């Protein structure tokens, strides 16, 4: 890894998506359109609700975002699974940022609640991840809680988000 800054802009996130941030074969973010945030505004390994790490990111919402045109015609809403995927993306980024090696895969979560929607008139989505635990053995496993806010109102809450980093010689779970 080149450096451990406390924030990253869009160009940095694209570099991570190209595999240029954490080294070959290690954690990568997806590239657009699946990259679900524009910037990481804060990342550390000693903050958050559990004192084990925090990562916060933002998505600028505009009515021309790709998913609004197809989900649903005449009733545009950001698919909830994309907000959830953003939280998994952030946990994987955190694991790479802390020096974890291997390719990232979402492994599940304990609980997810939606209490609102991201609609085209929303201006900004903020994602927050509070790291609960990082285990390092044959794989690197991160467990975290997260939330998503739309214009300062929390509308998604996820508990026990799980992401693993798998080295090339380790079996990567199917479907991840």
Curated annotation (Swiss-Prot):
Transmembrane segments: none annotated. Pathway: Lipid metabolism; fatty acid biosynthesis. The active site is at 71. The keyword Phosphoprotein does not apply. It catalyses: a (3R)-hydroxyacyl-[ACP] = a (2E)-enoyl-[ACP] + H2O; (3R)-hydroxydecanoyl-[ACP] = (2E)-decenoyl-[ACP] + H2O; (2E)-decenoyl-[ACP] = (3Z)-decenoyl-[ACP]. It is found in: Cytoplasm. GO terms for cellular component: cytoplasm. One of its GO terms (biological process) is unsaturated fatty acid biosynthetic process. GO terms for molecular function: (3R)-hydroxyacyl-[acyl-carrier-protein] dehydratase activity; trans-2-decenoyl-acyl-carrier-protein isomerase activity. Its main location: cytoplasm. Keywords: Cytoplasm, Fatty acid biosynthesis, Fatty acid metabolism, Isomerase, Lipid biosynthesis, Lipid metabolism, Lyase. Its EC number is 4.2.1.59, 5.3.3.14. InterPro entries: FabA, FabA_FabZ, HotDog_dom_sf. Necessary for the introduction of cis unsaturation into fatty acids. Catalyzes the dehydration of (3R)-3-hydroxydecanoyl-ACP to E-(2)-decenoyl-ACP and then its isomerization to Z-(3)-decenoyl-ACP. Can catalyze the dehydratase reaction for beta-hydroxyacyl-ACPs with saturated chain lengths up to 16:0, being most active on intermediate chain length. Belongs to the thioester dehydratase family. FabA subfamily. Homodimer. This is 3-hydroxydecanoyl-[acyl-carrier-protein] dehydratase. It comes from Rhodopseudomonas palustris (strain BisA53). The lineage of its organism: Bacteria, Pseudomonadati, Pseudomonadota, Alphaproteobacteria, Hyphomicrobiales. The gene is fabA.
């Amino acid at each position: 890894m080149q450096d451990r800054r406390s924030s990253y802009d869009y160009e940095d996130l694209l570099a991570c998506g190209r595999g240029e941030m954490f080294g070959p074969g290690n954690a990568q973010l997806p590239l657009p359109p699946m990259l679900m945030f524009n910037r990481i505004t804060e990342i550390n390994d000693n903050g958050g609700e559990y004192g084990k790490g925090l990562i916060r990111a933002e998505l600028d919402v505009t009515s021309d975002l790709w998913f609004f045109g197809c989900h649903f015609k005449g009733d545009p809403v950001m698919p909830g699974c994309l907000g959830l995927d953003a939280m998994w993306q952030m946990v994987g980024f955190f694991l790479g940022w802390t020096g974890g090696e291997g390719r990232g895969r979402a492994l599940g979560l304990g609980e997810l609640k939606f209490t609102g929607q991201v609609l085209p008139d929303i201006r900004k989505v903020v994602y927050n991840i509070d790291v609960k635990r990082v285990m390092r053995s044959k794989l690197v496993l991160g467990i975290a809680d997260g939330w998503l806010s739309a214009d300062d109102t929390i509308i998604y809450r996820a508990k026990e988000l799980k992401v693993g980093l798998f080295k090339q010689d380790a079996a990567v779970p199917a479907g991840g």
